[in-house]
């Protein structure tokens, strides 16, 4: 042989992988089309294959180039990595690894580092390289200078296969981008796009941590979709699933015949509820693998952030386990110290490599410091889903309006802990599946009450401190639960009620983005003040939102079927307060009967209360009103045109 049998890969290249410090493992392991020097023929091109299988007796690459009979790979000395270079093998080649375990049994495995895979139910890895030329430099530059906590964020959560069934990444780049732009969201969040064999898992049982699912096209097609979103001014968040992985015998589990990526002890290495394996976060190579996966989606696909799934299951050794089914940590506690260290590392590393990105935790417990910086003892996430707010709000919404007065405190409780973390308010896919019903079917009453209540609820949500996330279909009141195998119910999207709700979402996003009072101080107590937190008898909530420059918006939501036509309120400033939103507007399929003629006027109180003012406001039944203080405006005279 007159050339390097490992295609230029050496043991030195793998030291970072073994120490846990290599966060770009995809550049070394897996398959790569490379050109190397042959002593006799000069440069030759082929594919380098490399796979970590330290406990294997033998490893072969099987492929369509060798009629699936196998080419033996050799162990790179001292590395636990098997490699080979095969001349003439190019992009598009299908391959797998055949691994002989310690007991002599052969196992066919897909490449853990595959960057492209066959479409399910087939599962071979595919040799690929990217040829995409990005056109989002301006977007990336703005992102690097951004301050996410003090900027607007309204997120549209999308399952690509269920948005419009059958569309490719490139087709979605036209239709999805156009729709999200019209609706006015700042970001989309994609449910997992890493390769997964079982469609009803929605992508949460990953077998290809570096491989975009081929259901919708090639990796470069996904790059095209993300690029188009960026060019339209829309950020992209991707779901990432480092908490567990499936037991498919051709994937990561028992990869070389031993527990390589997972813990060997099922008390540490298996999720009984989900029937999946748990990563061994304390193993350096596993840490390198996972951190590389996270970095890969941001570096190679220009994702603007990751939403990390099921963080609570990672943090606790006794998560969903009975006594005796888990192993305490070295201090005798229930915290998974290795997972905590891993999460801190991945957050620190990604923020240092890509300033301005978003790291978001789906964390359902009260674990302290999820969004505190690592240097201050926190986990280092930028945001955390506010699951408490979500549960309390939906439970309240499902009540008969008469009974809501007895649960008023559940809606105000979120402000008790609002500033303990940086929150996103999520009404995600999890709330419209598994028999929970769609959002509209959760609400008691007839069509009018249901649509009015939804309009009121989402306006309440958009004005509450925290960023917003809604799952696709909610914006027009889809009536059935989410089903990944069919499209959303677009045929109802423009009917009465549905169309009004869709237009409301468009205006919520527009008004929200135009008014820093609604987002600039989400994580700062200066940005919120109750007007009345205790009006349980009227099911009415009212507060002020403020920005850094003192601009102020008064927000009112009435979850009762009774209008409040002369609702007396105290306000911090006298003068004109302009109505900028009324969910009872005819534009939103409301009645158009309950409004404030475009404004209210707050009169100063006599001494000693000169620092405050008093006014009356009309709040529609099952409705919301937002009023923005307008110090330069003069009160409209009777007969002046106004809007209800």
Curated annotation (Swiss-Prot):
Name of the top EC class for this enzyme: transferase
Secretion signal, residue range per the UniProt entry: none
UniProt xrefs under Pfam families: Alpha-amylase, Alpha-amylase_C, CBM_48
GO molecular function, one term: 1,4-alpha-glucan branching enzyme activity
UniProt keyword terms in alphabetical order: Carbohydrate metabolism, Glycogen biosynthesis, Glycogen metabolism, Glycosyltransferase, Transferase
Any one biological process term the GO annotation gives: glycogen biosynthetic process
CDD domains associated with the record: AmyAc_Glg_BE, E_set_GBE_prok_N
Annotated catalysed reactions: Transfers a segment of a (1->4)-alpha-D-glucan chain to a primary hydroxy group in a similar glucan chain
Residues annotated as catalytic: 309, 362
Assembly information from the UniProt record: Monomer.
Family classification: Belongs to the glycosyl hydrolase 13 family. GlgB subfamily.
HAMAP family linked: GlgB
NCBIfam families on file: branching_enzym (TIGR01515), PRK05402.1 (NF003811), PRK12313.1 (NF008967)
Protein function: Catalyzes the formation of the alpha-1,6-glucosidic linkages in glycogen by scission of a 1,4-alpha-linked oligosaccharide from growing alpha-1,4-glucan chains and the subsequent attachment of the oligosaccharide to the alpha-1,6 position.
Protein name (Swiss-Prot/TrEMBL): 1,4-alpha-glucan branching enzyme GlgB
Source species taxonomy: Bacteria, Bacillati, Actinomycetota, Actinomycetes, Propionibacteriales
């Amino acid at each position: 042989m007159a050339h390097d049998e490992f295609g230029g890969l050496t043991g030195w290249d793998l030291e970072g992988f073994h120490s846990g410090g290599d966060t770009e493992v995809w550049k070394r392991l897996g398959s790569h089309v490379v050109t190397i020097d042959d002593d006799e023929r000069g440069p030759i091109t082929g594919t380098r294959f490399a796979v970590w299988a330290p406990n294997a007796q033998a490893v072969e690459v099987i492929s369509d180039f060798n009629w699936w009979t196998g080419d033996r790979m050799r162990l790179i000395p001292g590395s636990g990595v098997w490699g080979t270079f095969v001349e003439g093998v190019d992009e598009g080649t299908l391959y797998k690894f055949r691994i002989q375990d310690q007991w002599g049994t052969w196992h066919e495995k897909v490449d853990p580092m595959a960057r492209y895979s066959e479409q399910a139910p087939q599962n071979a890895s595919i040799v690929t390289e990217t040829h995409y030329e990005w056109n989002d430099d301006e977007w990336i530059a703005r992102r690097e200078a951004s301050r996410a906590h003090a900027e607007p964020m309204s997120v549209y959560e999308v399952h690509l296969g269920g948005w419009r069934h059958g569309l490719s990444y490139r087709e979605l780049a036209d239709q999805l981008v156009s729709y999200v732009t019209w609706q006015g969201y700042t970001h989309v969040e994609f449910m997992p796009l890493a390769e997964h064999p079982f469609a009803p898992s929605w992508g949460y049982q990953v077998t290809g941590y570096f491989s975009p699912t081929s259901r919708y096209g090639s990796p470069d097609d996904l790059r095209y979709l993300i690029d188009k979103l960026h060019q339209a001014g829309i950020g992209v968040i991707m779901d990432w699933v480092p908490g567990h992985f499936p037991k498919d015998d051709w994937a990561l589990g028992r990869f070389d015949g031993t527990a390589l990526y997972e813990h060997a002890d099922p008390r540490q290495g298996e999720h009984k509820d989900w029937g999946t394996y748990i990563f061994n976060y304390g193993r350096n190579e596993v840490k390198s693998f996972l951190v590389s996966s996270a970095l890969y989606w941001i570096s190679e696909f220009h994702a603007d952030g990751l939403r990390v799934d099921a963080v609570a299951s990672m943090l606790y050794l006794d998560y969903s386990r009975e006594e005796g089914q888990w192993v305490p940590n070295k201090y005798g506690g229930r915290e998974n110290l290795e997972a905590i260290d891993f999460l801190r590392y991945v957050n620190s590393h990604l923020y240092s490599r890509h300033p301005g990105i978003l790291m978001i935790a789906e964390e359902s417990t009260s674990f302290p410091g999820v969004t505190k910086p690592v240097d201050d003892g926190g986990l280092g996430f930028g945001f955390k889903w506010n699951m408490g707010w979500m549960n309390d709000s939906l439970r309240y919404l499902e009540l008969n309006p008469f009974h809501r007065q007895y649960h008023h405190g559940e809606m105000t409780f979120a402000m008790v802990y609002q500033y303990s973390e940086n929150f996103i308010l999520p009404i995600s896919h999890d709330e419209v599946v598994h028999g929970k019903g769609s959002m509209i079917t959760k609400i008691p009453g007839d069509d009018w009450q249901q649509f009015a209540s939804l309009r009121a609820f989402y306006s309440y949500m958009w004005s509450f401190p925290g960023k917003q996330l809604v799952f696709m279909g909610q914006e027009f009141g889809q009536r059935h639960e989410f089903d990944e195998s069919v499209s959303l119910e677009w045929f109802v999207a423009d009917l009465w009620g549905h169309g009004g709700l869709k237009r409301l979402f468009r205006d919520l996003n527009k008004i929200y983005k135009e008014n820093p009072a609604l987002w600039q101080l989400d994580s700062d107590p200066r940005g919120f003040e109750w007007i009345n937190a205790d009006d349980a008898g009227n099911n009415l909530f009212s507060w002020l939102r403020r920005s850094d420059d003192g601009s102020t918006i008064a927000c009112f939501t009435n979850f009762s079927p009774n209008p409040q036509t002369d609702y007396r309120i105290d306000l911090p400033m006298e003068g004109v307060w302009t109505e900028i939103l009324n969910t009872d507007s005819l534009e939103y399929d409301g009645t158009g009967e309950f409004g404030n003629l475009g404004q209210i006027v707050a009169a100063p109180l006599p001494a000693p209360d000169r620092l405050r003012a008093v006014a009356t406001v009309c709040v529609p039944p099952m409705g919301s009103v937002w009023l923005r203080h307008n110090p330069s405006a003069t009160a409209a005279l009777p007969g002046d045109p106004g809007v209800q």
